[in-house]
Amino acid sequence: MTKTVQIGNRIIGGGNPILIQSMTNTKTENVEATAAQINQLTAAGCDIIRCAVPTMDAAKALKEIKKQVQIPVVADIHFDYRLAIAAMENGADKIRINPGNIGSAERVKAVVDIAKERNIPIRVGVNSGSLEKDLVEKYHGVTAEGLVESALDKVKLIEDMGYDNLVISIKSSDVMMCVKAHELIASQTDHPLHVGITEAGTIISGNIKSAIGLGLILHQGIGDTIRVSLTGDPLEEIKSAKLILKTLGLRQGGVEVVSCPTCGRTQINLIQLANQVENMVADIPLDIKVAVMGCVVNGPGEAKEADIGIAGGIGEGLIIKHGEVFKKVPESELLEALRYELLHWNE
């Protein structure tokens, strides 16, 4: 089991629930836009947020951003150790650094000293795209073994400076390399692990890669925080992360929507209806399964494993509860009838 690490008002590791992270895509210097996006992501289920800090103005903006948000803010630092120090001085709850790209050991120590003074966790990040040349040569290419050695070397560097309030992340866009790296490092450290497939891609490819990679890693009991990296709206990352955790049985809550793939018997616009249902239930705080079926012939039977379902017909639809037809309603009222049942579920 990994050690516990406190990040602002959240605790990770030590068997605590796996938390969902995302990253803002606003300019961090724009306080209002960044805070607004963080609050939107928080409402969707984000637990920890990371912000890019490429400038001193961005580091200073964290102080005002922190006043407007409720979840921990992680400062993402590259190259300039002074930005890491400024970010911590302005309220960052955690910093993410790659000690290999912020300069000499003295500069790393300057960052570690401030982190130690304020008890701010450091996430040590290693990425397959920036693996050290000597490790590439040693392992004849970028490999899981090289990534793990790089990460553990950087962890030891900081531990030797007298600080061990650390989180480790190993990222690769190669899904199976990423899986192997996590399997290797999990047996060699008790620091919490942040898990994600980097540069996963657009919504479709990114979701598939992340679901496979994170699924294989998390199913082995590895991982304390996750991010689904997508080229798109960060809100999509939260939706996907929640579904991955729920599918693996690692998080409860939230309505699960299942729907049939459509066939020649489909008598309604099922694709539109399923999307409408998915959007409708996003903010309903129930831990149930909802089925959306395309015909009244197979609908009741196929929806049997769901808590509630709907099936469309010609001009009318069925509301199905626990596999039994509960009521018939006009097709035009099907969505609203389902909404009513969900909002009054516990009555």
Where are these regions (language model features)?
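Catalytic alpha/beta core domains of metabolic enzymes, predominantly
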Residues: 127, 135-282
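N-terminal amphipathic alpha-helix/helix-capping segment at the start of soluble metabolic enzymes
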Residues: 1-23, 116, 279
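Alpha-helix-loop-beta-strand connector modules within alpha/beta enzyme cores
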Residues: 56-77, 110-122, 182-193, 277-279
